[in-house]
Amino acid sequence: MRCLGLMSGTSADGVDAVLADFRGSPNHPQWDLIRHVHHPYPEALRHRVVSAGQGEPSRADQWLDLAEAITEAQAMAARSCDPHAEAVLVGCHGQTIWHRPPTSQQRGASWQLLQAPLLAQLLERPVVHDFRAADLALGGQGAPLVPKADAALLGGTKGWRALLNLGGIANLTLIPPCCGPDRDASVQGWDCGPANSLIDLAVQQFSNGTLLFDRGGAMAKAGHSDETSIRRWLQEPYFQSPPPKSTGRELFGRANLQQRLNDLGRDCSSQDAVATLTSFSAAVVAQDLEQLMQRDRIRPLELIVAGGGRHNPVLMDQLQQRCRGLQLSSSQEMGLPVEAREALVFALLAWWHQRKHPGNSPSITGATRESVLGVLVHPG
């Protein structure tokens, strides 16, 4: 069955689209990646999405306009990826505006901006959307949803495999081996903390908006990181909390960046600040892997990296230095382009919805039970 997956993440740089074919068992599907594209958001739309994700107030009509613009961008990405309308089903995550994990005092909630009926009408195909809602209703975090799909798509190794996505947020998946004493262990996964979110915001601020990200790690390469600040930041509650946990720009956005820049002090150059934030993103992942070893005695054989951060050589070098003894590789080496992984996941989640197969993992999200994810809408 050919499905189209659409994903726009916390980096808010555009829409990743994947056309894939799935067949066989839902637990261990056979799959082929047919085509993938990246459709950039126009600068004005990107700015509106980032501002909305910082909690900046807008009028009701502005929210409607933004939802429509996001939906039209998703449709353009879909048409570009699937020009001959081969897909019979579309899985669309939408654009996360706000994510609130549950607490002991408050139910969890998550808002992905999208007009799904409009998207179904524009593409003339059924659309599965609102993937987080069912897990949240069952007391879960609603995220991350990628790990269970990762295990289905990329499992089958003799040792623990770690997959790291470096988007706006860094998230880890730990896939158990297919044999040996850990073969019946559960998939693990969580959001580590910021990957590109703080780096991108800092570069945009220091360049007065002329740069959107640290291309080639140039600014970080020209600076020196403040290891004292990094060690202090790693003691913050989120980084010391065990999974399940999920986060986004609500926690690691402009306000958080400003706090860290204030902490670094006025004498810190822009290059040193970006170098520190880049090293911090790597240190967050390294600390999580070390805590995993101490907590569960799990040490993965390899760390497979995907997402836009894979193209930042300074970030990758910092990961290699801080994750000693761990072999780093790219998802590209497994036939999965680094920008395509999450869009492929939402194509799979749409297929799972059609097959009535649960898409969440309670051991990851904290939900009370498994559930089929997503809401299906048909074109009128």
Swiss-Prot record:
Write the record's keywords in alphabetical order, separated by commas. ATP-binding, Carbohydrate metabolism, Kinase, Nucleotide-binding, Transferase
Which Gene3D superfamilies does the record cross-reference, listed alphabetically?
A: 3.30.420.40
Q: Name one GO molecular function term.
A: phosphotransferase activity, alcohol group as acceptor
Name a Pfam family for this protein: AnmK
Q: Which residues form a coiled coil?
A: none
Which NCBIfam families does the annotation name?
A: PRK09585.2-5
Its recorded name reads Anhydro-N-acetylmuramic acid kinase
What organism does this protein naturally occur in?
Synechococcus sp. (strain CC9902)
